[in-house]
Amino acid sequence: MDPNTVSSFQDILMRMSKMQLGSSSEDLNGMITQFESLKLYRDSLEEAVMRLGDLHSFQNRNGKWREQLGQKFEEIRWLIEEVRHRLKITENSFEQITFMQALQLLLEVEQEIRTFSFQLI
């Protein structure tokens, strides 16, 4: 993974974990968990692409990888909508900046996953 993307993930996760969003802290924890899961999935796709000769192994290890890919895109779309919603309702500038950066990162990661998945097909 690009070092800038890694630091962006780490920075956003750290800042989101410090936010206090009142009764929606459970939702925020869910978002953080999904961000972490998305990062791991993106890393595994990149690793499979980098070892393209190992594609057969990747497909055997994860026989339903196309189905999983579809689920990840659904998660990304949900996270994008959730981040946009949070961005609209928050008045705290720290939270606004964090959510804007999270939105940008999600869009970048979605594009990277699309690129990797096309290379694997």
From Swiss-Prot:
InterPro entries: Flu_NS2 (IPR000968). One of its GO terms (cellular component) is host cell nucleus. Belongs to the influenza viruses NEP family. It comes from the Viruses. Average number present in a viral particle is estimated to be 130-200 molecules. Pfam families: Flu_NS2. A motif (Nuclear export signal) lies at residues 12-21, 85-94. The keyword Transport applies. Interacts with protein M1. May interact with host nucleoporin RAB/HRB and exportin XPO1/CRM1. Mediates the nuclear export of encapsidated genomic RNAs (ribonucleoproteins, RNPs). Acts as an adapter between viral RNPs complexes and the nuclear export machinery of the cell. Possesses no intrinsic RNA-binding activity, but includes a C-terminal M1-binding domain. This domain is believed to allow recognition of RNPs bound to the protein M1. It comes from Influenza A virus (strain A/Fort Warren/1/1950 H1N1). GO terms for biological process: exit of virus from host cell nucleus through nuclear pore. Keywords: Host nucleus, Host-virus interaction, Transport, Virion. This is Nuclear export protein. Its main location: virion. It is found in: Virion; Host nucleus. Gene3D superfamilies: 1.10.287.230.
